[in-house]
Protein backbone atom coordinates (compact mmCIF):
# COMPACT_ATOMS: atom_id res chain seq x y z
CA UNK A 1 0.00 0.00 0.00
CA UNK A 2 2.99 2.31 0.43
CA UNK A 3 4.02 2.10 -3.26
CA UNK A 4 3.04 4.90 -5.64
CA UNK A 5 2.99 2.51 -8.61
CA UNK A 6 1.87 -1.11 -8.65
CA UNK A 7 2.50 -3.34 -11.68
CA UNK A 8 1.03 -6.81 -12.20
CA UNK A 9 2.23 -8.99 -15.08
CA UNK A 10 -0.38 -11.58 -16.05
CA UNK A 11 1.22 -12.49 -19.40
CA UNK A 12 3.49 -15.21 -18.04
CA UNK A 13 1.41 -16.83 -15.32
CA UNK A 14 -2.39 -16.98 -15.26
CA UNK A 15 -2.20 -17.54 -11.49
CA UNK A 16 -1.29 -13.85 -11.18
CA UNK A 17 -4.77 -12.80 -12.39
CA UNK A 18 -6.45 -13.57 -9.08
CA UNK A 19 -3.77 -11.79 -7.08
CA UNK A 20 -3.88 -8.76 -9.40
CA UNK A 21 -7.66 -8.43 -8.94
CA UNK A 22 -7.30 -8.72 -5.17
CA UNK A 23 -4.62 -6.00 -5.19
CA UNK A 24 -6.58 -3.53 -7.34
CA UNK A 25 -9.72 -4.11 -5.23
CA UNK A 26 -7.83 -3.56 -1.98
CA UNK A 27 -6.26 -0.37 -3.31
CA UNK A 28 -9.61 0.92 -4.53
CA UNK A 29 -11.09 0.50 -1.05
CA UNK A 30 -8.29 2.63 0.41
CA UNK A 31 -8.70 5.59 -1.99
CA UNK A 32 -9.93 7.91 0.75
CA UNK A 33 -6.69 7.37 2.68
CA UNK A 34 -4.34 8.13 -0.22
CA UNK A 35 -2.26 11.26 0.35
CA UNK A 36 -1.17 11.29 -3.30
CA UNK A 37 -2.19 9.56 -6.47
CA UNK A 38 -1.36 5.90 -6.97
CA UNK A 39 -0.99 4.16 -10.31
CA UNK A 40 -1.97 0.55 -10.98
CA UNK A 41 -0.78 -1.03 -14.26
CA UNK A 42 -2.02 -4.41 -15.47
CA UNK A 43 0.35 -5.89 -18.03
CA UNK A 44 -1.91 -8.02 -20.20
CA UNK A 45 -1.61 -9.63 -23.62
CA UNK A 46 -2.83 -9.01 -27.16
CA UNK A 47 -4.45 -12.45 -26.94
CA UNK A 48 -7.49 -10.62 -25.56
CA UNK A 49 -7.80 -9.25 -29.14
CA UNK A 50 -7.13 -12.57 -30.92
CA UNK A 51 -10.67 -13.14 -32.24
CA UNK A 52 -11.49 -9.52 -33.10
CA UNK A 53 -13.21 -8.96 -36.43
CA UNK A 54 -11.21 -7.00 -39.05
CA UNK A 55 -11.79 -3.25 -39.06
CA UNK A 56 -12.21 -3.37 -42.84
CA UNK A 57 -13.71 -6.59 -44.24
CA UNK A 58 -12.08 -5.84 -47.59
CA UNK A 59 -8.63 -5.11 -46.16
CA UNK A 60 -7.26 -7.41 -43.46
CA UNK A 61 -4.05 -5.39 -43.24
CA UNK A 62 -5.65 -2.46 -41.40
CA UNK A 63 -4.14 -2.63 -37.88
CA UNK A 64 -5.99 -2.31 -34.59
CA UNK A 65 -5.05 0.61 -32.32
CA UNK A 66 -5.81 1.57 -28.71
CA UNK A 67 -9.01 3.32 -29.79
CA UNK A 68 -10.51 -0.01 -30.87
CA UNK A 69 -10.18 -1.70 -27.47
CA UNK A 70 -13.95 -1.79 -26.90
CA UNK A 71 -14.31 -3.94 -30.04
CA UNK A 72 -11.76 -6.54 -28.98
CA UNK A 73 -12.70 -10.23 -28.85
CA UNK A 74 -10.60 -12.55 -26.74
CA UNK A 75 -9.15 -15.95 -27.48
CA UNK A 76 -11.19 -18.67 -25.67
CA UNK A 77 -8.19 -19.58 -23.50
CA UNK A 78 -7.76 -15.99 -22.29
CA UNK A 79 -11.16 -15.31 -20.72
CA UNK A 80 -9.60 -14.63 -17.30
CA UNK A 81 -7.28 -12.06 -18.85
CA UNK A 82 -10.01 -9.99 -20.53
CA UNK A 83 -12.16 -10.11 -17.39
CA UNK A 84 -9.20 -8.81 -15.40
CA UNK A 85 -8.71 -5.99 -17.93
CA UNK A 86 -12.34 -4.89 -17.58
CA UNK A 87 -12.25 -4.93 -13.77
CA UNK A 88 -9.00 -2.93 -13.63
CA UNK A 89 -10.37 -0.27 -16.01
CA UNK A 90 -13.58 -0.04 -13.96
CA UNK A 91 -11.65 0.83 -10.78
CA UNK A 92 -9.78 3.75 -12.37
CA UNK A 93 -12.60 6.26 -12.62
CA UNK A 94 -11.21 8.52 -9.89
CA UNK A 95 -7.96 9.14 -11.76
CA UNK A 96 -6.84 11.97 -9.46
CA UNK A 97 -6.57 9.53 -6.57
CA UNK A 98 -6.19 6.13 -8.23
CA UNK A 99 -5.29 5.76 -11.92
CA UNK A 100 -5.52 2.29 -13.46
CA UNK A 101 -4.09 1.20 -16.80
CA UNK A 102 -4.11 -1.88 -18.97
CA UNK A 103 -1.22 -2.51 -21.37
CA UNK A 104 -1.89 -5.10 -24.08
CA UNK A 105 1.58 -6.41 -24.80
CA UNK A 106 2.65 -8.21 -27.96
CA UNK A 107 4.71 -11.40 -27.84
CA UNK A 108 7.69 -10.50 -25.68
CA UNK A 109 11.21 -11.22 -26.93
CA UNK A 110 14.71 -10.33 -25.77
CA UNK A 111 16.79 -11.31 -22.72
CA UNK A 112 16.39 -15.08 -22.24
CA UNK A 113 14.14 -15.45 -25.28
CA UNK A 114 10.65 -15.61 -23.80
CA UNK A 115 8.17 -17.71 -25.77
CA UNK A 116 10.63 -17.90 -28.67
CA UNK A 117 13.18 -19.62 -26.43
CA UNK A 118 12.06 -23.03 -27.71
CA UNK A 119 13.25 -22.10 -31.21
CA UNK A 120 16.42 -20.44 -29.91
CA UNK A 121 17.30 -23.59 -27.97
CA UNK A 122 16.63 -25.91 -30.92
CA UNK A 123 18.79 -23.71 -33.14
CA UNK A 124 21.62 -23.34 -30.63
CA UNK A 125 21.84 -27.05 -29.87
CA UNK A 126 21.87 -27.85 -33.60
CA UNK A 127 20.20 -31.22 -33.09
CA UNK A 128 17.58 -30.77 -35.84
CA UNK A 129 18.24 -30.24 -39.57
CA UNK A 130 15.52 -27.57 -39.78
CA UNK A 131 13.47 -25.52 -37.31
CA UNK A 132 9.74 -26.32 -37.35
CA UNK A 133 7.12 -23.78 -38.42
CA UNK A 134 3.72 -24.84 -37.13
CA UNK A 135 1.03 -24.46 -39.78
CA UNK A 136 1.62 -22.37 -42.89
CA UNK A 137 3.50 -19.72 -40.87
CA UNK A 138 1.75 -16.78 -42.55
CA UNK A 139 0.04 -15.54 -39.37
CA UNK A 140 1.14 -12.09 -38.18
CA UNK A 141 2.36 -11.94 -34.58
CA UNK A 142 2.45 -8.57 -32.76
CA UNK A 143 5.64 -8.45 -30.69
CA UNK A 144 7.80 -6.16 -28.56
CA UNK A 145 11.21 -6.25 -26.91
CA UNK A 146 10.98 -6.55 -23.12
CA UNK A 147 13.15 -3.46 -22.62
CA UNK A 148 10.87 -1.42 -24.89
CA UNK A 149 7.87 -2.76 -22.97
CA UNK A 150 9.52 -1.57 -19.76
CA UNK A 151 9.94 1.84 -21.42
CA UNK A 152 6.19 1.99 -22.14
CA UNK A 153 5.38 1.21 -18.51
CA UNK A 154 7.90 3.79 -17.29
CA UNK A 155 6.27 6.45 -19.49
CA UNK A 156 2.81 5.60 -18.11
CA UNK A 157 4.10 6.10 -14.56
CA UNK A 158 5.84 9.35 -15.50
CA UNK A 159 3.06 10.93 -17.59
CA UNK A 160 -0.17 9.32 -16.27
CA UNK A 161 -1.95 9.65 -19.66
CA UNK A 162 -5.68 10.15 -20.01
CA UNK A 163 -6.01 7.06 -22.18
CA UNK A 164 -6.20 4.05 -19.85
CA UNK A 165 -5.92 1.21 -22.37
CA UNK A 166 -2.66 1.07 -24.32
CA UNK A 167 -1.17 -1.28 -26.90
CA UNK A 168 2.56 -2.08 -26.66
CA UNK A 169 4.01 -3.52 -29.88
CA UNK A 170 6.96 -2.66 -32.13
CA UNK A 171 6.56 -1.28 -35.66
CA UNK A 172 7.32 -4.53 -37.49
CA UNK A 173 4.78 -6.87 -39.06
CA UNK A 174 6.37 -10.31 -38.76
CA UNK A 175 4.84 -13.69 -39.46
CA UNK A 176 5.70 -16.85 -37.55
CA UNK A 177 7.71 -17.97 -40.58
CA UNK A 178 9.69 -14.70 -40.52
CA UNK A 179 10.61 -15.16 -36.86
CA UNK A 180 11.59 -18.83 -37.09
CA UNK A 181 13.48 -18.35 -40.36
CA UNK A 182 15.43 -15.47 -38.82
CA UNK A 183 16.42 -17.57 -35.79
CA UNK A 184 17.39 -20.53 -37.98
CA UNK A 185 19.49 -18.38 -40.29
CA UNK A 186 21.38 -16.52 -37.56
CA UNK A 187 22.04 -19.23 -34.97
CA UNK A 188 20.75 -22.51 -36.37
CA UNK A 189 20.82 -24.84 -39.36
CA UNK A 190 19.60 -22.11 -41.72
CA UNK A 191 16.54 -24.07 -42.77
CA UNK A 192 12.89 -24.29 -41.72
CA UNK A 193 10.30 -27.00 -42.17
CA UNK A 194 6.56 -26.43 -42.14
CA UNK A 195 4.79 -29.04 -40.03
CA UNK A 196 1.16 -29.53 -38.92
CA UNK A 197 0.07 -27.47 -35.93
CA UNK A 198 -0.60 -30.69 -34.01
CA UNK A 199 3.14 -31.46 -34.07
CA UNK A 200 3.68 -28.56 -31.68
CA UNK A 201 2.37 -30.72 -28.85
CA UNK A 202 5.32 -33.07 -29.40
CA UNK A 203 7.63 -30.25 -28.30
CA UNK A 204 7.70 -30.53 -24.52
CA UNK A 205 8.79 -26.93 -23.88
CA UNK A 206 5.74 -25.49 -25.70
CA UNK A 207 2.69 -25.06 -23.48
CA UNK A 208 -0.82 -24.46 -24.81
CA UNK A 209 -0.52 -20.79 -23.84
CA UNK A 210 2.76 -20.42 -25.74
CA UNK A 211 1.26 -22.12 -28.78
CA UNK A 212 -1.74 -19.76 -28.72
CA UNK A 213 0.65 -16.79 -28.86
CA UNK A 214 2.59 -18.32 -31.76
CA UNK A 215 -0.51 -19.07 -33.82
CA UNK A 216 -2.32 -15.75 -33.34
CA UNK A 217 -2.98 -13.76 -36.52
CA UNK A 218 -3.31 -10.11 -35.60
CA UNK A 219 -2.14 -6.74 -36.91
CA UNK A 220 -1.74 -4.05 -34.27
CA UNK A 221 -0.22 -0.59 -34.07
CA UNK A 222 0.83 1.21 -30.88
CA UNK A 223 -0.35 4.56 -32.19
CA UNK A 224 -0.70 6.35 -28.84
CA UNK A 225 2.70 5.12 -27.63
CA UNK A 226 4.38 6.22 -30.85
CA UNK A 227 2.84 9.71 -30.82
CA UNK A 228 2.92 10.56 -27.10
CA UNK A 229 5.72 8.66 -25.37
CA UNK A 230 9.44 9.34 -25.43
CA UNK A 231 11.01 5.88 -25.49
CA UNK A 232 14.63 4.92 -26.15
CA UNK A 233 13.75 2.02 -28.39
CA UNK A 234 15.94 -1.07 -28.38
CA UNK A 235 14.10 -2.81 -31.22
CA UNK A 236 11.57 -0.35 -32.66
CA UNK A 237 11.96 -1.87 -36.13
CA UNK A 238 11.24 -5.35 -34.84
CA UNK A 239 12.76 -8.75 -34.22
CA UNK A 240 14.29 -9.50 -37.61
CA UNK A 241 16.04 -6.14 -38.00
CA UNK A 242 17.60 -6.42 -34.53
CA UNK A 243 18.38 -10.14 -34.45
CA UNK A 244 22.11 -9.66 -33.77
CA UNK A 245 21.60 -7.71 -30.54
CA UNK A 246 18.73 -10.04 -29.55
CA UNK A 247 20.96 -13.09 -30.04
CA UNK A 248 23.71 -11.46 -28.01
CA UNK A 249 21.25 -10.82 -25.15
CA UNK A 250 19.94 -14.37 -25.32
CA UNK A 251 23.38 -15.96 -25.15
CA UNK A 252 24.62 -13.68 -22.38
CA UNK A 253 21.43 -14.05 -20.32
CA UNK A 254 21.60 -17.83 -20.46
CA UNK A 255 25.39 -18.11 -20.22
CA UNK A 256 25.65 -19.76 -23.65
CA UNK A 257 28.96 -18.21 -24.64
CA UNK A 258 31.22 -20.39 -26.82
CA UNK A 259 34.37 -21.89 -25.31
CA UNK A 260 37.22 -21.80 -27.84
CA UNK A 261 40.28 -23.90 -27.01
CA UNK A 262 43.49 -24.75 -28.85
CA UNK A 263 45.63 -27.72 -27.72
CA UNK A 264 49.21 -27.77 -29.05
CA UNK A 265 52.30 -29.85 -28.42
CA UNK A 266 54.73 -32.45 -29.81
CA UNK A 267 53.53 -35.79 -31.21
CA UNK A 268 52.45 -38.44 -28.64
CA UNK A 269 52.14 -35.85 -25.86
CA UNK A 270 48.40 -36.59 -25.50
CA UNK A 271 46.77 -33.75 -27.46
CA UNK A 272 43.97 -35.84 -28.98
CA UNK A 273 43.10 -37.78 -25.82
CA UNK A 274 42.98 -34.60 -23.72
CA UNK A 275 41.02 -32.77 -26.44
CA UNK A 276 38.52 -35.63 -26.59
CA UNK A 277 37.93 -35.60 -22.83
CA UNK A 278 37.58 -31.80 -22.74
CA UNK A 279 35.18 -31.93 -25.72
CA UNK A 280 32.99 -34.40 -23.81
CA UNK A 281 33.10 -32.37 -20.60
CA UNK A 282 32.33 -29.01 -22.22
CA UNK A 283 30.21 -30.41 -25.12
CA UNK A 284 32.47 -28.78 -27.71
CA UNK A 285 33.34 -29.71 -31.27
CA UNK A 286 36.64 -31.60 -31.54
CA UNK A 287 38.40 -30.17 -34.61
CA UNK A 288 40.91 -32.64 -36.10
CA UNK A 289 42.70 -31.71 -39.31
CA UNK A 290 42.16 -35.07 -40.98
CA UNK A 291 38.40 -34.91 -40.38
CA UNK A 292 38.14 -31.26 -41.46
CA UNK A 293 39.90 -31.90 -44.78
CA UNK A 294 37.88 -35.06 -45.49
CA UNK A 295 34.62 -33.28 -44.67
CA UNK A 296 35.47 -30.26 -46.85
CA UNK A 297 36.42 -32.40 -49.85
CA UNK A 298 33.25 -34.50 -49.42
CA UNK A 299 31.14 -31.32 -49.46
CA UNK A 300 32.84 -30.08 -52.62
CA UNK A 301 32.31 -33.43 -54.32
CA UNK A 302 28.64 -33.36 -53.31
CA UNK A 303 28.27 -29.90 -54.88
CA UNK A 304 29.81 -30.88 -58.20
CA UNK A 305 27.94 -34.20 -58.37
CA UNK A 306 25.18 -34.11 -61.04
CA UNK A 307 21.71 -33.41 -59.63
CA UNK A 308 18.24 -33.81 -61.03
CA UNK A 309 16.63 -30.44 -61.73
CA UNK A 310 13.78 -29.60 -59.37
CA UNK A 311 10.60 -28.20 -60.86
CA UNK A 312 9.71 -24.70 -59.78
CA UNK A 313 13.29 -23.57 -59.24
CA UNK A 314 13.75 -19.93 -60.07
CA UNK A 315 16.16 -18.84 -62.77
CA UNK A 316 18.32 -16.88 -60.34
CA UNK A 317 18.70 -19.88 -58.06
CA UNK A 318 19.78 -22.07 -60.98
CA UNK A 319 22.45 -19.55 -62.04
CA UNK A 320 23.74 -19.26 -58.47
CA UNK A 321 23.90 -23.04 -58.19
CA UNK A 322 25.87 -23.24 -61.45
CA UNK A 323 28.36 -20.69 -60.13
CA UNK A 324 28.76 -22.72 -56.92
CA UNK A 325 29.39 -25.87 -58.95
CA UNK A 326 32.04 -24.11 -61.06
CA UNK A 327 33.77 -22.71 -57.96
CA UNK A 328 33.69 -26.08 -56.21
CA UNK A 329 35.11 -27.87 -59.27
CA UNK A 330 37.89 -25.30 -59.58
CA UNK A 331 38.76 -25.74 -55.90
CA UNK A 332 38.74 -29.54 -56.20
CA UNK A 333 41.09 -29.36 -59.18
CA UNK A 334 43.43 -27.11 -57.19
CA UNK A 335 43.40 -29.54 -54.25
CA UNK A 336 44.16 -32.50 -56.50
CA UNK A 337 47.05 -30.66 -58.15
CA UNK A 338 48.43 -29.56 -54.76
CA UNK A 339 48.41 -33.10 -53.39
CA UNK A 340 50.10 -34.46 -56.52
CA UNK A 341 52.89 -31.91 -56.25
CA UNK A 342 53.41 -32.39 -52.49
CA UNK A 343 53.48 -36.19 -52.19
CA UNK A 344 49.90 -36.46 -51.01
CA UNK A 345 50.07 -33.54 -48.58
CA UNK A 346 47.78 -30.52 -48.84
CA UNK A 347 49.17 -26.99 -48.95
CA UNK A 348 48.59 -24.67 -46.00
CA UNK A 349 46.36 -22.32 -48.01
CA UNK A 350 43.76 -25.07 -48.46
CA UNK A 351 44.03 -26.39 -44.91
CA UNK A 352 43.63 -22.90 -43.46
CA UNK A 353 40.66 -22.21 -45.73
CA UNK A 354 38.90 -25.40 -44.62
CA UNK A 355 39.68 -24.87 -40.93
CA UNK A 356 38.48 -21.28 -41.07
CA UNK A 357 35.20 -22.39 -42.68
CA UNK A 358 34.77 -25.04 -40.00
CA UNK A 359 35.42 -22.60 -37.13
CA UNK A 360 32.93 -20.16 -38.64
CA UNK A 361 30.24 -22.83 -38.96
CA UNK A 362 27.18 -22.29 -36.77
CA UNK A 363 27.82 -25.22 -34.36
CA UNK A 364 31.33 -23.93 -33.59
CA UNK A 365 30.03 -20.37 -33.22
CA UNK A 366 27.35 -21.56 -30.81
CA UNK A 367 29.04 -24.11 -28.55
CA UNK A 368 32.71 -23.52 -29.31
CA UNK A 369 35.50 -25.84 -30.37
CA UNK A 370 38.78 -27.53 -29.48
CA UNK A 371 41.48 -27.18 -32.12
CA UNK A 372 43.60 -30.32 -31.94
CA UNK A 373 47.25 -29.73 -32.88
CA UNK A 374 46.72 -26.81 -35.26
CA UNK A 375 48.08 -24.27 -36.09
CA UNK A 376 51.63 -25.54 -35.83
CA UNK A 377 53.55 -22.40 -36.85
CA UNK A 378 53.42 -18.64 -36.39
CA UNK A 379 52.55 -18.10 -40.06
CA UNK A 380 49.73 -20.66 -39.98
CA UNK A 381 48.26 -18.98 -36.89
CA UNK A 382 48.57 -15.56 -38.51
CA UNK A 383 46.86 -16.70 -41.73
CA UNK A 384 44.12 -18.49 -39.81
CA UNK A 385 43.19 -15.94 -37.16
CA UNK A 386 44.19 -12.52 -38.52
CA UNK A 387 41.54 -10.33 -40.09
CA UNK A 388 41.52 -10.87 -43.82
CA UNK A 389 41.60 -7.18 -44.69
CA UNK A 390 45.09 -6.41 -43.36
CA UNK A 391 46.47 -2.97 -44.06
CA UNK A 392 50.07 -4.11 -44.33
CA UNK A 393 51.71 -7.47 -44.64
CA UNK A 394 54.47 -6.59 -42.20
CA UNK A 395 53.23 -6.17 -38.66
CA UNK A 396 55.08 -4.46 -35.89
CA UNK A 397 56.03 -7.04 -33.29
CA UNK A 398 54.63 -6.40 -29.80
CA UNK A 399 51.63 -4.55 -31.19
CA UNK A 400 48.22 -6.22 -31.09
CA UNK A 401 47.21 -6.61 -34.72
CA UNK A 402 43.61 -7.08 -35.89
CA UNK A 403 42.43 -10.64 -35.43
CA UNK A 404 39.12 -12.41 -35.93
CA UNK A 405 37.63 -12.66 -32.44
CA UNK A 406 34.90 -14.95 -33.75
CA UNK A 407 37.31 -17.85 -34.31
CA UNK A 408 40.41 -17.01 -32.26
CA UNK A 409 40.82 -19.35 -29.26
CA UNK A 410 40.08 -18.02 -25.82
CA UNK A 411 42.32 -20.63 -24.16
CA UNK A 412 45.57 -22.02 -25.57
CA UNK A 413 47.26 -25.01 -23.96
CA UNK A 414 50.84 -25.98 -24.70
CA UNK A 415 51.54 -29.58 -23.71
CA UNK A 416 55.15 -30.75 -23.55
CA UNK A 417 57.41 -33.54 -22.33
CA UNK A 418 61.01 -34.64 -22.78
CA UNK A 419 61.96 -36.53 -25.94
CA UNK A 420 62.87 -39.58 -23.83
CA UNK A 421 59.42 -39.60 -22.23
CA UNK A 422 57.67 -39.32 -25.60
CA UNK A 423 59.83 -42.04 -27.20
CA UNK A 424 59.17 -44.39 -24.30
CA UNK A 425 55.42 -43.68 -24.48
CA UNK A 426 55.35 -44.55 -28.20
CA UNK A 427 57.47 -47.67 -27.65
CA UNK A 428 54.95 -48.89 -25.05
CA UNK A 429 52.01 -48.52 -27.43
CA UNK A 430 50.51 -51.78 -28.76
CA UNK A 431 51.58 -52.72 -32.29
CA UNK A 432 47.93 -52.62 -33.42
CA UNK A 433 47.71 -48.95 -32.41
CA UNK A 434 51.02 -47.93 -34.00
CA UNK A 435 50.53 -49.71 -37.34
CA UNK A 436 49.72 -47.33 -40.19
CA UNK A 437 49.92 -44.16 -38.06
CA UNK A 438 52.47 -41.40 -37.58
CA UNK A 439 53.59 -43.24 -34.44
CA UNK A 440 55.70 -45.67 -36.46
CA UNK A 441 59.34 -45.24 -35.46
CA UNK A 442 60.66 -43.36 -38.50
CA UNK A 443 57.65 -41.07 -38.89
CA UNK A 444 57.43 -40.33 -35.17
CA UNK A 445 61.11 -39.38 -34.83
CA UNK A 446 60.85 -37.22 -37.94
CA UNK A 447 57.70 -35.48 -36.62
CA UNK A 448 59.26 -34.93 -33.20
CA UNK A 449 62.42 -33.49 -34.72
CA UNK A 450 60.38 -31.17 -36.96
CA UNK A 451 58.30 -29.96 -33.99
CA UNK A 452 61.46 -29.14 -32.01
CA UNK A 453 62.94 -27.30 -35.00
CA UNK A 454 59.92 -25.03 -35.56
CA UNK A 455 59.64 -24.19 -31.86
CA UNK A 456 63.13 -22.87 -31.22
CA UNK A 457 62.83 -19.44 -32.88
CA UNK A 458 61.16 -16.31 -31.56
CA UNK A 459 58.32 -16.70 -34.04
CA UNK A 460 56.61 -19.80 -32.68
CA UNK A 461 52.87 -20.36 -32.59
CA UNK A 462 52.97 -19.63 -28.86
CA UNK A 463 54.58 -16.25 -29.54
CA UNK A 464 51.66 -15.42 -31.80
CA UNK A 465 49.15 -15.95 -29.00
CA UNK A 466 51.36 -14.06 -26.54
CA UNK A 467 51.26 -11.09 -28.92
CA UNK A 468 47.46 -11.24 -28.78
CA UNK A 469 47.71 -11.35 -24.98
CA UNK A 470 46.20 -14.83 -25.01
CA UNK A 471 48.87 -16.38 -22.82
CA UNK A 472 49.18 -20.15 -23.26
CA UNK A 473 48.76 -22.57 -20.36
CA UNK A 474 51.95 -24.67 -20.37
CA UNK A 475 51.76 -28.19 -18.90
CA UNK A 476 54.70 -30.60 -18.69
CA UNK A 477 52.96 -33.95 -19.07
CA UNK A 478 56.17 -35.86 -18.33
CA UNK A 479 56.38 -34.47 -14.79
CA UNK A 480 52.78 -35.37 -13.90
CA UNK A 481 53.45 -39.15 -14.05
CA UNK A 482 49.87 -39.78 -15.13
CA UNK A 483 49.41 -42.09 -18.12
CA UNK A 484 45.70 -41.21 -18.43
CA UNK A 485 46.37 -37.43 -18.36
CA UNK A 486 43.78 -36.97 -15.61
CA UNK A 487 45.88 -34.37 -13.78
CA UNK A 488 46.43 -32.35 -16.96
CA UNK A 489 42.69 -32.44 -17.75
CA UNK A 490 41.86 -31.42 -14.18
CA UNK A 491 44.29 -28.48 -14.38
CA UNK A 492 42.81 -27.31 -17.70
CA UNK A 493 39.24 -27.54 -16.41
CA UNK A 494 40.28 -25.39 -13.44
CA UNK A 495 41.76 -22.78 -15.82
CA UNK A 496 38.86 -22.81 -18.30
CA UNK A 497 36.05 -22.84 -15.74
CA UNK A 498 32.55 -24.25 -15.81
CA UNK A 499 30.75 -25.39 -18.99
CA UNK A 500 28.70 -22.72 -20.79
CA UNK A 501 25.76 -24.67 -22.13
CA UNK A 502 22.29 -25.91 -21.23
CA UNK A 503 23.74 -28.61 -19.01
CA UNK A 504 22.58 -32.18 -19.17
CA UNK A 505 19.52 -33.08 -21.21
CA UNK A 506 16.76 -35.15 -19.61
CA UNK A 507 18.15 -38.24 -21.34
CA UNK A 508 21.68 -37.48 -20.11
CA UNK A 509 20.37 -36.84 -16.59
CA UNK A 510 18.55 -40.19 -16.67
CA UNK A 511 21.74 -41.85 -17.93
CA UNK A 512 23.79 -40.14 -15.20
CA UNK A 513 21.28 -41.23 -12.55
CA UNK A 514 21.29 -44.77 -13.93
CA UNK A 515 25.07 -44.79 -13.95
CA UNK A 516 25.20 -43.40 -10.40
CA UNK A 517 22.67 -46.02 -9.25
CA UNK A 518 24.69 -48.79 -10.89
CA UNK A 519 27.88 -47.48 -9.30
CA UNK A 520 26.14 -47.27 -5.92
CA UNK A 521 24.79 -50.83 -6.23
CA UNK A 522 28.20 -52.07 -7.38
CA UNK A 523 29.83 -50.29 -4.44
CA UNK A 524 27.29 -51.73 -2.00
CA UNK A 525 27.76 -55.20 -3.51
CA UNK A 526 31.53 -54.82 -3.24
CA UNK A 527 31.22 -53.66 0.37
CA UNK A 528 28.88 -56.59 1.17
CA UNK A 529 31.25 -59.05 -0.51
CA UNK A 530 34.20 -57.51 1.31
CA UNK A 531 32.32 -57.74 4.64
CA UNK A 532 31.36 -61.36 3.99
CA UNK A 533 34.93 -62.16 2.99
CA UNK A 534 36.21 -60.43 6.12
CA UNK A 535 33.75 -62.35 8.32
CA UNK A 536 34.68 -65.62 6.59
CA UNK A 537 38.37 -64.86 7.09
CA UNK A 538 37.77 -64.02 10.76
CA UNK A 539 35.76 -67.25 11.23
CA UNK A 540 38.43 -69.31 9.48
CA UNK A 541 41.08 -67.62 11.59
CA UNK A 542 39.05 -68.27 14.74
CA UNK A 543 38.61 -71.97 13.81
CA UNK A 544 42.31 -72.24 13.01
CA UNK A 545 43.19 -70.66 16.38
CA UNK A 546 40.75 -73.04 18.14
CA UNK A 547 42.27 -76.06 16.42
CA UNK A 548 45.76 -74.81 17.22
CA UNK A 549 44.77 -74.32 20.87
CA UNK A 550 43.29 -77.84 21.11
CA UNK A 551 46.39 -79.24 19.46
CA UNK A 552 48.63 -77.46 21.95
CA UNK A 553 46.40 -78.58 24.86
CA UNK A 554 46.71 -82.22 23.80
CA UNK A 555 50.45 -81.76 23.49
CA UNK A 556 50.64 -80.32 27.01
CA UNK A 557 48.56 -83.18 28.43
CA UNK A 558 50.77 -85.72 26.68
CA UNK A 559 53.88 -84.05 28.04
CA UNK A 560 52.35 -84.06 31.56
CA UNK A 561 51.55 -87.78 31.29
CA UNK A 562 55.05 -88.55 30.13
CA UNK A 563 56.48 -86.47 32.97
CA UNK A 564 54.30 -88.25 35.53
CA UNK A 565 55.36 -91.59 34.15
CA UNK A 566 59.00 -90.61 34.34
CA UNK A 567 58.56 -89.27 37.88
CA UNK A 568 56.70 -92.45 39.02
CA UNK A 569 59.46 -94.95 38.00
CA UNK A 570 61.57 -94.66 41.23
CA UNK A 571 58.45 -95.02 43.37
CA UNK A 572 57.41 -98.19 41.58
CA UNK A 573 60.89 -99.61 41.88
CA UNK A 574 60.93 -98.88 45.60
CA UNK A 575 57.48 -100.45 46.11
CA UNK A 576 58.42 -103.53 44.12
CA UNK A 577 61.69 -103.97 46.00
CA UNK A 578 60.85 -103.12 49.61
CA UNK A 579 57.10 -103.04 50.04
CA UNK A 580 55.38 -105.45 47.71
CA UNK A 581 57.16 -108.71 48.74
CA UNK A 582 56.27 -108.31 52.46
CA UNK A 583 52.80 -106.97 51.59
CA UNK A 584 52.11 -109.96 49.32
CA UNK A 585 53.17 -112.35 52.03
CA UNK A 586 50.89 -110.58 54.53
CA UNK A 587 47.95 -110.76 52.13
CA UNK A 588 48.54 -114.44 51.50
CA UNK A 589 48.75 -115.12 55.22
CA UNK A 590 45.57 -113.11 55.79
CA UNK A 591 43.78 -115.21 53.20
CA UNK A 592 44.89 -118.36 54.94
CA UNK A 593 43.93 -117.30 58.48
CA UNK A 594 40.86 -115.29 57.56
CA UNK A 595 40.81 -113.16 60.70
CA UNK A 596 37.79 -111.17 61.81
CA UNK A 597 39.67 -107.88 61.26
CA UNK A 598 41.84 -108.35 58.13
CA UNK A 599 43.25 -104.83 58.28
CA UNK A 600 44.36 -105.12 61.87
CA UNK A 601 45.79 -108.56 61.11
CA UNK A 602 47.71 -107.23 58.07
CA UNK A 603 49.06 -104.29 60.08
CA UNK A 604 50.24 -106.57 62.84
CA UNK A 605 51.81 -108.90 60.29
CA UNK A 606 53.72 -106.11 58.54
CA UNK A 607 54.93 -104.74 61.86
CA UNK A 608 56.27 -108.16 62.95
CA UNK A 609 57.80 -109.05 59.57
CA UNK A 610 59.32 -105.60 58.65
CA UNK A 611 62.69 -106.48 57.09
CA UNK A 612 64.35 -103.40 58.58
CA UNK A 613 63.36 -104.45 62.11
CA UNK A 614 64.64 -108.01 61.82
Curated annotation (Swiss-Prot):
One of its GO terms (cellular component) is motile cilium. AMP binds at residues 323-346, 373-376, 380, 446. Pfam families: ADK (PF00406), Dpy-30 (PF05186). Residues 288-346 are annotated as: NMP. Its main location: cytoplasm. GO terms for molecular function: (d)CMP kinase activity; adenylate kinase activity; ATP binding; nucleoside diphosphate kinase activity. Residues 311-327 have a biased composition (Acidic residues). ATP binds at residues 268-273, 478. Residues 376-568 form a coiled coil. Nucleoside monophosphate (NMP) kinase that catalyzes the reversible transfer of the terminal phosphate group between nucleoside triphosphates and monophosphates. Has highest activity toward AMP, and weaker activity toward dAMP, CMP and dCMP. Also displays broad nucleoside diphosphate kinase activity. Involved in maintaining ciliary structure and function. This is Adenylate kinase 7. The gene is Ak7.
Amino acid sequence: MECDAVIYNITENVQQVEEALWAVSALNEEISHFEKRKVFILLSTVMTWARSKPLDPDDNEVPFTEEDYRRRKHHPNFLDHINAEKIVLKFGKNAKKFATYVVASGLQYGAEGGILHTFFKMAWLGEVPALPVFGDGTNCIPAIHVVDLAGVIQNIIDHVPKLHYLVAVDEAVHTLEDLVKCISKNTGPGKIQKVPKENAFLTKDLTQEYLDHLLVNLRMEALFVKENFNIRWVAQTGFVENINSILKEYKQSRGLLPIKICILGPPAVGKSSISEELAKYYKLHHIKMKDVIAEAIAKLEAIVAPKDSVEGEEEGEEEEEEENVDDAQELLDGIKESMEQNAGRLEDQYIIRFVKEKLKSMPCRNQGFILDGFPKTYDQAKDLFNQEEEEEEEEIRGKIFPYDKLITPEFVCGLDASDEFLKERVMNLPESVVAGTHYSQDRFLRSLSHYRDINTDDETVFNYFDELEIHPIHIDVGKLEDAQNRLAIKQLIKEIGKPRNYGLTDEEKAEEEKKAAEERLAKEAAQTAELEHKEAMEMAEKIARWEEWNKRLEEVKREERELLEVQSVPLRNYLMTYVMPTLMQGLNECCKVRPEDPVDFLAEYLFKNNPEMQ
